């Protein structure tokens, strides 16, 4: 249960003179009901380790603490650290705040295993962080689930089904290594200040064992294919040696366009290409 003596979040923001910094991709989320809803997406967090990136003044952090989680939050905006320190003082056994850049932290070493990542990600680094987590060198990864706020367009790319307009490289990567679903949209009016675009919460859980294929191979093929997404595969992949043979062995018609190729089919193409290139 959240400490009833906590100062209201808006009052904390006003007292510390905080405002969202566009340079850091910040948009503060203050709606407590919405924050509680986000915290419920991963399931029961009681005594679970949760990693939060970019907590800002601590709105989502409060919801996670209320849910019983043990939270490690990393924040690069030093203006927010005093407000987070006050929150940590209320929850000394539940909240650890790290001042730093999430892209530079050795998360597995700091956090251990079986970590739930829950974050309203800064828009300017959200996709880079997702790719970092999806391409963990060891699998199973150190994280157990990802519950992340993105711009709605990015969320749709992550969860897009084959044959739909948003299906692309990010869809293939995310769905190769995880089960990804769009949990719910979030209206721009929920943020302070309101961003220009709508947002959405995405939930990802790692697959037990992604089908055997090197990350480099998948990235090479999908980059070439989707960089020319309106072209047939025989055009977009023609400069990769042995690729036409790999398509034939995988039973893929070279006149198809990349948005019609499923994740499983990209994996099959990659496997045959690796054998031919060995």
Curated annotation (Swiss-Prot):
Entry keywords, A to Z: Cytoplasm, Methyltransferase, RNA-binding, rRNA processing, S-adenosyl-L-methionine, Transferase
Sequence similarity: Belongs to the class I-like SAM-binding methyltransferase superfamily. rRNA adenine N(6)-methyltransferase family. RsmA subfamily.
Gene Ontology CC entries for this record: cytosol
Pfam assignment, any one: RrnaAD
Organism: Zymomonas mobilis subsp. mobilis (strain ATCC 31821 / ZM4 / CP4)
Entry's EC annotation: 2.1.1.182
Alphabetized PROSITE patterns for the sequence: RRNA_A_DIMETH (PS01131), SAM_RNA_A_N6_MT (PS51689)
Reactions performed catalytically: adenosine(1518)/adenosine(1519) in 16S rRNA + 4 S-adenosyl-L-methionine = N(6)-dimethyladenosine(1518)/N(6)-dimethyladenosine(1519) in 16S rRNA + 4 S-adenosyl-L-homocysteine + 4 H(+)
A GO molecular-function descriptor: 16S rRNA (adenine(1518)-N(6)/adenine(1519)-N(6))-dimethyltransferase activity
InterPro entries reported for this sequence: KsgA/Erm, rRNA_Ade_diMease-like_C, rRNA_Ade_Mease_Trfase_CS, rRNA_Ade_methylase_Trfase_N, rRNA_adenine_dimethylase, SAM-dependent_MTases_sf
Annotated protein name in UniProt: Ribosomal RNA small subunit methyltransferase A
Location(s), subcellular: Cytoplasm
Known function: Specifically dimethylates two adjacent adenosines (A1518 and A1519) in the loop of a conserved hairpin near the 3'-end of 16S rRNA in the 30S particle. May play a critical role in biogenesis of 30S subunits.
Highest taxon of source: Bacteria
Entry binding sites for S-adenosyl-L-methionine: 27, 29, 54, 75, 101, 120
Gene3D superfamilies named in the record: Ribosomal RNA adenine dimethylase-like, domain 2 (1.10.8.100), Vaccinia Virus protein VP39 (3.40.50.150)
